[in-house]
Amino acid sequence: MNINATLIGQSVAFFIFVLFCMKFVWPPVIAALQERQKKIADGLDAANRAARDLELAHEKAGQQLREAKAQAAEIVEQAKKRANQIVDEARDQARTEGERLKAQAQAEIEQELNSVKDALRAQVGALAVTGAEKILGASIDANAHEQLVSKLAAEI
């Protein structure tokens, strides 16, 4: 192998080319590679954060769903209790109103019975006086007639 000026010239040119590349070409390529590597790392970190956030969101949504179901069940239970309470109150009011109406009706019946008894006593007294007049053949004066009817009504 002969070392001549061409080989030395080519070596010097290659060395200059390498220096030129190291000085002007290599730094932007390295910077671009580092920037790309940083973007990829940031993207992976963002993807990991997004995956964790998604998992937390799923857990939070599940928790909120469970809480909403529990709250809905509690509201339904309270509504059932309130409905039963309203039914019981209505039943008690109806019973009280029924007893009041029954007592009022009994009082009216008692009052009507007493007035019928009084009317019957007066009629019986009048019939008795009329019968007595017919039997005796004479008329009793009005004052005596009234006293006799009152006395007879009191006895009956």
From Swiss-Prot:
UniProt membrane topology term: Single-pass membrane protein
Quaternary structure and partners: F-type ATPases have 2 components, F(1) - the catalytic core - and F(0) - the membrane proton channel. F(1) has five subunits: alpha(3), beta(3), gamma(1), delta(1), epsilon(1). F(0) has three main subunits: a(1), b(2) and c(10-14). The alpha and beta chains form an alternating ring which encloses part of the gamma chain. F(1) is attached to F(0) by a central stalk formed by the gamma and epsilon chains, while a peripheral stalk is formed by the delta and b chains.
Pfam families reported in the protein's UniProt record: ATP-synt_B (PF00430)
GO molecular function: proton-transporting ATP synthase activity, rotational mechanism; proton-transporting ATPase activity, rotational mechanism
Function per UniProt: F(1)F(0) ATP synthase produces ATP from ADP in the presence of a proton or sodium gradient. F-type ATPases consist of two structural domains, F(1) containing the extramembraneous catalytic core and F(0) containing the membrane proton channel, linked together by a central stalk and a peripheral stalk. During catalysis, ATP synthesis in the catalytic domain of F(1) is coupled via a rotary mechanism of the central stalk subunits to proton translocation.
Signal peptide region: none
Keywords: ATP synthesis, Cell inner membrane, Cell membrane, CF(0), Hydrogen ion transport, Ion transport, Membrane, Transmembrane, Transmembrane helix, Transport
Compartments (UniProt record): Cell inner membrane
Name of the featured protein: ATP synthase subunit b
Transmembrane residue ranges: 12-32
NCBIfam families hit by this protein: ATP_synt_b, PRK05759.1-2, PRK05759.1-4
InterPro entries: ATP_synth_B-like_membr_sf, ATP_synth_b/b'su_bac/chlpt, ATP_synth_F0_bsu_bac, ATP_synthase_B_chain
Family: Belongs to the ATPase B chain family.
Cellular component terms (Gene Ontology): plasma membrane; proton-transporting ATP synthase complex
Chief location category: membrane
Domain of life: Bacteria
